[in-house]
């Protein structure tokens, strides 16, 4: 009997378990999934909590509800992964030996990487919205805020869901308008990138949205430290930005267990083949989702497209066939733009976000790189799709590989 | 893309001026490339960064990030910004004859 081990039961690990459990021959393979937490968070929903659109109950469900019934599940922290010995040691002393391992340990924020961030004012007037604690604490602040200067800062790239900070400022503009205090709130978006987004066409399009919504864009700003006493954010070159409310997107890093196990780069992301998703160092290790070092977005949609490719490659590996180098960096992101509207972008390693219709060329119903009400409904419907289809590994009517059909070169 | 003569050697450069082939680079080219980036004199500290980048690129096959220079090269981030103001990763890569570092999405 051989053993497939899935490390991490978040979006990526859960999808993979659900895809593989029905197809692996149960006389030859057993599957174990390890995770240290019981609760699954719908992370795209964190964006909506500070504005009172979602609350905590809207974004949590028990992880166990989503695991297939015919696999073993271990809820326990991992001490160390020893890929040279094909085994994982748990903190309670248990040792799990595997033949094949899929790592899906994700990424998380690490505010402690920035000097002065985690002081007395952390979650007082400095917040993240990438954790349930940060998003709910920020809700309590914003609910009673009477205005001032809100600075939204991306500390360094890469970050999970690179469009979320933009959505955050778009929603802030909408929310404070609805509250009747938009004239009392200054919004400044501060990013280390040269523009609003990485890719030129989308950066220009989204940059124009910032201008239209009277949100100040400060680019090429590499955050070095926070002076909590004087409510000031400094760059490494001592440029100063004052704030009353600082919303930070801190340094994102892979899991500490990856660092402890010597499997990651400086940010604990695992060097991974960008097309086959095999570890660059260990043949019987595959990596999925935010845990990789791929130059793709860290997002659920990316994990979903990767999962389609990995599903095939795991079977090929087991059957001794050559792997398929089929992952193209495909990402698909709804960008909530406020006032009940949204933007959709669809892109991959080589093709930047372009205008057009999606998923049906010429028809839609969604519009690429345009602001529409339908795109907003796509975003809001996605929560249902996520819980009921995506996590369960169901087929969605979107190909893993990006297509140029329906897109316009500009 | 264009060819240019740096320190007496003809090299190919991309649209932004980065050397096309890192193996074309010699240490003699660095002062000229530095001037193009607005750095008049390369000090020992500059050279420490350049040499680390060259060596790391040879070993890893990719241009090191600022974080990698800090963690693996032992060069404080603050120093990098002082030595190569406004974008140390790009400027240092330019002077070290390496390609433009890949931005993330």
List each language-model region with its residue ranges.
Chain B
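A short, structure-level motif marking secondary-structure boundaries and short turns
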Residues: 14-16, 50-52, 74
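A short, ordered amphipathic alpha-helix with a cationic face
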Residues: 18-24, 55-58, 66-67, 79-80
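Metallocofactor- and cofactor-centric catalytic cores in central/energy metabolism, strongly enriched
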Residues: 30, 35-54, 58-59, 66, ...
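General structural signal for secondary-structure boundaries
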Residues: 26, 43-45, 76
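N-terminal first-folded block
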Residues: 4-36
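Helix-rich interaction surfaces within compact, conserved domain-sized segments
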Residues: 13, 65-105
